[in-house]
A protein has these predicted regions:
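Beta-lactam-recognizing serine transpeptidase/beta-lactamase-like catalytic domain environment
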Residues: 1-26, 31-256
Length: 256
């Protein structure tokens, strides 16, 4: 029983969407970017960084994927290209107290109300953490773990201009004659970010698809926005992520 319900490749009965906990990799940069914009509302556009593929921050060596050199990047470009070195540079200067508060607000270490059991995502950085933990954390590595369900909910909030609706499974129940006997009424669960910041993230997520790492989704068949991620897995196969939404003008579907 443990073999088929534990989090391993042979676990055929594990609901990975709600029960699997994985390092989010670069999909976590959504929150790092959000915190940076909240702390620098009038100057975040002035961020500039020269990427040569690797850097050392707080005695930790960080490289971009395959040591790719992105050259000079601003925040939007660093996000679209998923530039690790740019993000650890800006992330190392964040107000840790505010950053911890943002992660709590965005459902880390929290019970998520849902019809199915959901494991708590883990965010372990605190004001007392060693500074060497910060570089890995801000790019979605280190001790941070998320369920795909949680990651999808964060994207729902971004697509919905900052407001997260309470998730549910059953839309309505019908009687034998086809009439609706019970209906789930959508309700607001929480405002995770301001509408202004959500719209900034929407633009950045769109650029991931049109000119960044999510280019495979750039098609005439539909429009999409989102964030890619690759998380190291202790010498095993890496965890590959994509979280995003379709129909960018009027978002209708979030996937993770």
């Amino acid at each position: 029983w443990d073999k088929i319900t534990s989090d391993s490749s042979e676990s055929c009965l594990l609901n990975r969407a709600t029960q699997g906990l994985y390092p989010p990799g670069s999909t976590y940069k959504v929150l790092t970017a959000l915190e940076y914009m909240e702390e620098h509302p009038n100057s975040y556009k002035n961020f500039s960084y020269e990427c040569d593929g690797q850097t050392i921050v707080n005695s930790v060596r960080i490289s971009c994927y395959e040591n790719e050199e992105h050259g000079e990047v601003d925040l939007d470009r660093a996000f679209a290209k998923s530039c690790n070195t740019a993000f650890v540079t800006l992330g190392s200067k964040l107000d840790i107290k505010n950053f911890v508060s943002l992660n709590k607000k965005c459902l880390f270490n929290q019970e998520i109300p849902f019809d199915l059991a959901v494991k708590k995502s883990r965010f372990e950085l605190t004001q007392n953490s060693d500074k060497s933990e910060i570089p890995q954390t801000v790019i979605g590595q280190g001790n941070t773990l998320m369920t795909p369900f949680h990651n999808a909910l964060l994207m729902c909030a971004v697509a919905n201009e900052g407001t997260l609706m309470k998730p549910y499974v059953v839309d309505h129940v019908e009687g034998a004659d086809g009439t609706t006997v019970k209906e789930t009424i959508p309700e607001i669960y929480a405002d995770l970010m301001s509408e202004k910041d959500a719209k900034k993230l929407q633009k950045m997520l769109r650029e991931v698809v049109t000119s960044g790492t999510g280019y495979n989704l750039d098609t005439d068949l539909y429009t999409a926005a989102g964030k890619t991620g690759t998380a190291e897995n202790e010498g095993k196969y890496a965890h590959a992520w994509f979280v995003g939404y379709s129909n960018v003008e009027d978002p209708d579907l979030v996937v993770c």
